[in-house]
């Protein structure tokens, strides 16, 4: 029984039940017709209705594609600069002020700034890139910096080159840090993309755009039901990402690699 309760997947499922019950309580506390805080029943009814609409998939694909571009750009920069900074502390200290600045800038300020500086249509991509880069960068740096020096010295004794030590020793051992950073930044980038789409108001066929439109739809008596239903797509996607993280983490642990944030 104790082993059953301590199982992470069982606890995850119990957590989902708790969140659902909390959702029901909050919806009953605020209103009963779904105009302000719709219940899970109303939300899922609308959710399944949206599942039958091809436009929903176009919006989801549009948002994921734009988010993927921003995430991919930030990953490339983080990969290159993170490896350099992880292997050369002087490079890390040189880039540290930039990382602090990027971490500190409010996302809303970036939205307003890039709407003015570049095409509003492309602003969400650049915002995702800037927000994700520091997280991914720290993941690469942290992973490489925490590799046991004994492995590096053993590779040097075997005659491994500088690039071979990075590719076949440091990066594999740094994977737990990198995976955690990737999952965290991916989840954040999805939320940022939706928010940026909603705030710019210029992107077509995006989840942020349809959420903003649903909120201001005067013909809809319960606009928040539609908003919650579209938001549910993001929640379910993040649950899938979390499951993938658990599977990858379990695989890394099976391979004998140290796991970070595994509680």
Where are these regions (language model features)?
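Transmembrane alpha-helical segments of polytopic membrane transport and secretion proteins
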Residues: 1-17, 239-263
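Periplasmic/extracellular loop-to-transmembrane helix junction in inner-membrane transport proteins
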Residues: 3, 29-72
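Alpha-helical transmembrane segments of multi-pass membrane proteins
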Residues: 11, 57, 61-70, 103, ...
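Transmembrane-helix boundary motif in ABC transporter permease subunits
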Residues: 69-99
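Generic hydrophobic transmembrane alpha-helix motif, especially the helices
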Residues: 100-135, 142
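Transmembrane alpha-helices
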Residues: 126-130, 163-195
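Hydrophobic alpha-helical transmembrane segments of polytopic membrane proteins
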Residues: 206-245
């Amino acid at each position: 029984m104790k082993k059953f309760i301590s199982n992470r997947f069982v606890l995850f499922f119990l957590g989902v039940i708790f969140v659902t019950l909390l959702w029901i309580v909050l919806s009953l506390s605020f209103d009963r017709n779904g105009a302000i805080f719709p219940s899970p029943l109303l939300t899922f009814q609308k959710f399944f209705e949206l599942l039958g609409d091809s436009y929903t998939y176009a919006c989801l694909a549009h948002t994921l594609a734009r988010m993927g571009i921003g995430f991919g750009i930030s990953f490339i920069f983080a990969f290159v600069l993170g490896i350099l900074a992880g292997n050369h502390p002087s490079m890390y200290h040189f880039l540290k002020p930039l990382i602090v600045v990027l971490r500190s800038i409010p996302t809303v300020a970036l939205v307003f700034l890039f709407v003015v500086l570049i095409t509003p249509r492309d602003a969400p991509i650049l915002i995702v890139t800037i927000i994700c880069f520091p997280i991914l960068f720290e993941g690469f740096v942290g992973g490489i910096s925490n590799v046991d020096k004994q492995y590096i010295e053993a590779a040097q004794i075997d005659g491994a080159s500088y690039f071979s030590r990075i590719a076949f020793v440091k990066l594999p051992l740094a994977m737990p840090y990198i995976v955690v950073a990737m999952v965290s930044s991916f989840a954040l980038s999805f939320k940022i993309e939706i928010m940026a789409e909603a705030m710019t108001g210029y992107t077509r066929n995006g989840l942020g755009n349809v959420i903003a439109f649903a909120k201001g739809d005067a013909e809809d008596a319960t606009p928040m039901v539609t908003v919650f239903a579209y938001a549910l797509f993001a929640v379910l996607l993040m649950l899938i990402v979390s499951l993938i993280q658990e599977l990858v983490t379990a695989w890394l642990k099976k391979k004998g690699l140290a796991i970070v944030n595994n509680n």
